[in-house]
Amino acid sequence: MDFSTVKSLTIPEGNVIKIMSGNVVLWTKPEEPGPTPSGDLPPSNQVWYEAPAILPEYNLGSPVSHTYDESTKRGVLTYSEDIRQSVDVHYFAFRGTPITKIWWPDCCTSWDGDCMHTCPNLKEIYAGSALHSISDGTCNGGTSPEKIVLYNNENFYANETGLVKKSDNTLYLGTVNLDIRNTPCTTLGSRCMADMHLTDKTLYFPSTMNSSTGDWNIGGETPEPYTIYLPCSTAPNWTLSYIRGIITWHIPATNSGYENWKTHQSDWTFVEDL
């Protein structure tokens, strides 16, 4: 099947369907995997696809079947159980598909950027609660999503002193924006910015970040999210925090972009050494 043009899936009889999260379907084909639209062989016979024309129905105990509802013009999947498996998303997983949005399963722990290679319509990625590693620096071929959205993430949370990590979790930010409005984060840090394909990017802050000075309106009264643009010259080991009403961008004194951004001290509180 040429996934570069298909807009919905008709699941052949005998195939195994697993609804992972939202509309994302894991289609395991019984035959040997063929080449991708680009001619490359995928690493397995699993094809990930967002199928908006397929409506999952949770009918526990029923066999897997696929029907088409003429009244709603939607395909209906009926399957025996909701199977959620631990999975990392890797190279070619979505390659060549016309998807516009990806929901990672809550159990997904990591992904690499080339799993979305040549998906020119991809706009948003929703990352589940178990995610601890994002690498988007290899999203090329017109693929880079516009925004990564974290929701209910249990590996990144914060208290009154800033970001608390359960382990050495890192968000590798490269070419995309990051939406953390649905997380309790009050601090965001990175230790690898200089190694990525950098562009100016936007952080969408959660409602827990509200300024008491009136100079900022972050996640506050306005209907549109407030955005902060980080310069591409930002080096590793910066931390952005909101503590006791003060927004602080901690950057090492050796940061090459530090002098350029001293002019923004009316907007930021600088701490020269972490």
Walk through the language-model features, giving the residues of each.
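N-terminal accessory interaction module
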Residues: 60-65
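Short, surface-exposed terminal/edge motifs of secreted or surface/virion proteins that either
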Residues: 24-31, 173-178, 259-264
